[in-house]
From Swiss-Prot:
Brain. Keywords: Amidation, Neuropeptide, Secreted. Coiled coil: none annotated. One of its GO terms (biological process) is neuropeptide signaling pathway. Myoactive peptide. Increases the amplitude and frequency of spontaneous contractions and tonus of hindgut muscle. It comes from Rhyparobia maderae (Madeira cockroach). GO terms for cellular component: extracellular region. This is Tachykinin-related peptide 9. The keyword Signal does not apply.
């Protein structure tokens, strides 16, 4: 999974 997606969720 892309880290960018996780950061955007926060």
């Amino acid at each position: 999974a892309p880290s960018m997606g996780f950061q955007g969720m926060r």
